[in-house]
């Protein structure tokens, strides 16, 4: 049966849902005043203990004066003890931002800037079989040669925590419509390769956007990165 609306004014639905240690789920999303897509933007969190039928009253978990945090991507640390949340800075006045929680999302650290290489929009990532993180997003790093295109960052969780650049970034797909791409889906396939899916205008001409998948393995991109050095 169709459930009634939650009544949470927002720009878009949850951009991240993560399972908590007690089996409940934490949903994160962003909004502006009145739920509209205008500054100042803030990130909110809500919980469900019944599989999504009901949700708690949302609480603001991230906001910064002069910055517009949005599109949270939340994931768990390799040891399972910490939640990490990557956020877009919507005005592109700064790098992206990141915050951490060690109490299952009840409280969060103050948002801080990510490394330059993780600066962008619409982050989504997976853990590769070797334990490294592969995070895909629309590149918006200042002075980046791949600004506006679909890229992936490869590195460790410790790199993110310490503000290190990680192993490398790689351009996955070229956008022929400016920076109009992203909102990726990411899957690790049974053979260990990674499937990244995005909407993108992948070739010039009259054709408009398509939904495109690109498949790669960290071993393959490692070789490409080494060859580029």
Give each language-model segment a name.
Residues 1-229:
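Asp-box/BNR beta-propeller blade signature and adjacent active/binding-site loops
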């Amino acid at each position: 049966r169709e459930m009634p609306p939650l009544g949470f004014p927002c720009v878009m639905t949850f951009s991240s849902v993560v399972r908590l240690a007690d089996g409940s789920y934490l949903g994160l999303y962003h909004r502006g005043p009145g739920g509209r897509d205008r500054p100042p933007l803030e990130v909110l969190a809500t919980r469900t203990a019944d599989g999504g039928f009901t949700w708690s009253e949302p609480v603001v978990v991230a906001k910064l004066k002069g910055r517009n945090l949005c599109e949270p991507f939340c994931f768990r640390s390799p040891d399972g003890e910490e939640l990490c949340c990557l956020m877009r800075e919507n005005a592109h006045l700064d790098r992206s931002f990141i915050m951490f929680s060690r109490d299952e999302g009840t409280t969060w650290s103050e948002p801080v800037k990510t490394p330059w290489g993780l600066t962008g929009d619409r982050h989504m990532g997976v853990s590769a079989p070797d334990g490294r993180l592969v995070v895909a997003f629309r590149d918006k790093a200042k002075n980046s040669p791949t600004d506006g295109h679909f890229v992936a960052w490869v590195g460790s969780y410790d790199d993110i925590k310490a503000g290190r650049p990680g192993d490398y970034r790689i351009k996955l797909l070229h956008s022929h419509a400016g920076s109009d791409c992203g909102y990726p889906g990411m899957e690790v396939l049974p053979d260990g390769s990674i499937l990244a899916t995005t909407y993108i205008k992948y070739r010039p001409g009259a054709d408009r956007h398509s939904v495109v998948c690109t498949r790669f393995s960290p071993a393959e991109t490692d070789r490409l990165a080494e060859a580029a050095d």
